[in-house]
A protein has these predicted regions:
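Short beta-strand/loop motif that positions the catalytic acidic residue
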Residues: 47-49, 54-60
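Short, conserved loop/helix-junction motifs that constitute active-site signature segments
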Residues: 46-48, 77-78
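Short alpha-helix in the alpha/beta-hydrolase fold that links the catalytic acid
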Residues: 50, 64-74
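C-terminal catalytic histidine-bearing segment of alpha/beta-hydrolase fold enzymes
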Residues: 80-163
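Active-site nucleophile elbow and catalytic-triad environment of alpha/beta-hydrolase enzymes
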Residues: 28-44, 50
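Hydrolase active-site cap/lid region
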Residues: 1-34
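Extracytoplasmic/secreted cell-surface and envelope-processing proteins
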Residues: 2-4, 62-65
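Acidic catalytic loop of the alpha/beta-hydrolase fold
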Residues: 58-63, 91-93
Length: 163
């Protein structure tokens, strides 16, 4: 169900004032999604015998691990073909860092620091040519280097699912 997640995000952005917006958010969601508005991921997962892999970082601050994530509803999931893969490795256990190697995350920190220095040098009005040079200097392969062990766990799930 989307409303708890929307409200959690809203609380982070607007604090308790988000509750004043609740009726309008609810109406918008209902008009946008119609009959499917009340469906939940748990209902969908339980309605099938299809293998399902649920991934989550235990320090995810975007989709709260213990609050609104699918994995927080683990005790409601009855599909016996569900597998859970929780990343608890420091720095890789957030929302957007699950798949990347620690080396990639270190490199991203380095290039972000360089980018911050460029921003500060130009007062956040960086000339296009400087931006072009900066982005051209980024090693796209290093930025996206995957954590092989984590990816192997995912591949194992898929290989088992198609047997």
């Amino acid at each position: 169900e989307a409303m708890p997640m929307i409200m959690e995000w809203g609380m982070g952005m607007a604090g308790p004032l988000i509750y004043l917006e609740y009726p309008f958010i609810w109406l918008n969601q209902k008009l946008t999604f119609g009959d499917t508005f009340g469906l939940t991921a748990v209902d969908a997962i339980n309605s099938t015998d299809t293998p399902v892999l649920i991934l989550h970082g235990d320090e995810d601050t975007t989709v709260g691990y213990d609050t609104v994530s699918i994995i927080s509803k683990k005790n409601e999931i009855t599909n016996p073909n569900v597998r859970y893969l929780v990343c608890d490795v420091d720095r890789r256990n957030g929302h957007n860092s699950l798949f990347y190697s620690l080396e990639a995350l270190d490199y991203v920190d380095e290039i972000n620091e360089i980018g911050s220095r460029i921003d500060e040098r130009y007062g956040y009005d960086v000339p296009e040519e400087v931006l072009r040079e900066y982005y051209a200097s980024v090693d796209k392969f290093r930025v996206r280097e995957l954590d092989r062990g984590f990816m192997e766990s995912i591949l194992t799930f898929y290989r088992d699912a198609v047997k």
